[in-house]
Amino acid sequence: MQIFVTTPSENVFGLEVAADMAYEDLLAFVEMEASVPSKDIILSLNGNPIVDTDPKATIGSLGVTDNSMLLLTTKRVAPNPSTSAQPAIPTLDFSSIQIPGLPAAQRVDPRAEQIRTQILERADSLDQLKLSNPELAEHVHDSQKFSDAFTKLQNELRAKEVERKKELQRLYADPDNEDNQKRIMEIIRQENVEESYQNAMEHHPEMFIRTDMLYINCRINGHDVKAFVDTGAQMTILSEEFCEKVGLSHMLDVKFAGVARGVGSGKILGRVHSVPLQIGSSFFPASVSVIEGDQLQFILGLDMLKRFKANVNLRTNQLEIGEEKATFLGEKDLPDEFGKLGQEKEKKQDHGSAGDAFKDEDIVNLMSLGYSREKVVVALKQTDGDVELAASLLFSQ
């Protein structure tokens, strides 16, 4: 349920709580939100101060219900019960108070709305939010749902902070205990890691943006293909299936058959010594190794890149080779068989095996190159299920 607290400065903030929450935990939440020590807080419900109450009592037993409005005052300004000359706190009914312009069941947190507006004004902020909190990003176009998710997140953070403080209190009560010392060190380590993460997200959010791999448009023997530019691949590679598709199987020299060894091993069927490779309007004679299987199409390897003094120019987003400047393709231009990043890939993974979240067919195809299941799964995880990139990773390492 959601309750609202009014501060002495007439600010209102919402809290997502449960009826069985202890009163002392509610005070801890209010302390974090209002920056007032819990020992100085007095909460009033319907004008009646909640005082001399068992800290362990549930807020439901105290009469707090969904959409309750609590008034926050402090002991420094609260009436002194021992002084009869001071007037009593007037009895006010807050149960009927509503935030103007909004129905009781739908109140938007003004802080959440401010954050949502700022995010919508900056595309990079939305990208960062998608990485750090997908749930908030999902509701960024709906003010009410965003506010609800924001309130839920804030309350979860408060609850974690309350639990952390309680745990530290317990640990420091017996600092000589060896297990307590280990746990304290672990908490400190986690805090340092989290601080480093938050600093990186704040100052270098671009480091968390997924990077597109480098592909260019080209033609092999008159057939269009998206070439994966891989400076980590020693050889230029065609798959067996694609070799047949472009009509080069009859040119395969099986004397060069063998086994490619890297992290694992893959069967090389042979080599086609002269392949008409067209990039832009220029032709480049290429020698390609043909690999067993159908999970690869075409990888432009280091042998070709060095031979033609190619330059991977990330500043201009182009591959400069010979007189040509081929622009690297954006994610939206990649065909499905290359394992597009984002939504398309997630859909593929959703149909994968329950154990590894990858399709059994993809795992079997990669294992046919001579790699163990464990190494194949690791490669798929490293490439987010991208079969093309996983095969390249396994082969080129």
UniProtKB/Swiss-Prot annotation:
Statement: the UniProt record of this protein carries the keyword tRNA processing: no
Origin superkingdom: Eukaryota
Alphabetized InterPro entries for the sequence: DDI1_N, Peptidase_A2_cat, Peptidase_aspartic_DDI1-type, Peptidase_aspartic_dom_sf, UBA, UBA-like_sf, Ubiquitin-like_dom, Ubiquitin-like_domsf
CDD domains: RP_DDI (cd05479), UBA_scDdi1_like (cd14309), Ubl_Ddi1_like (cd01796)
Record-annotated Ubiquitin-like domain positions: 1-79
Any one GO BP annotation for this protein: protein secretion
Keywords annotated in UniProt: Aspartyl protease, Cytoplasm, Hydrolase, Protease, Protein transport, Transport
A GO-annotated cellular component: plasma membrane
Localisation: Cytoplasm
Catalytic activity, EC: 3.4.23.-
Active site feature: 230
Primary site of residence: cytoplasm
Described purpose of this protein according to its UniProt entry: Probable aspartic protease. May be involved in the regulation of exocytosis. Acts as a linker between the 19S proteasome and polyubiquitinated proteins via UBA domain interactions with ubiquitin for their subsequent degradation. Required for S-phase checkpoint control.
Subunit structure comment from the entry: Binds ubiquitin and polyubiquitinated proteins.
Protein name (database record): DNA damage-inducible protein 1
Lineage: Eukaryota, Fungi, Dikarya, Ascomycota, Saccharomycotina
Gene name of the encoded protein: DDI1
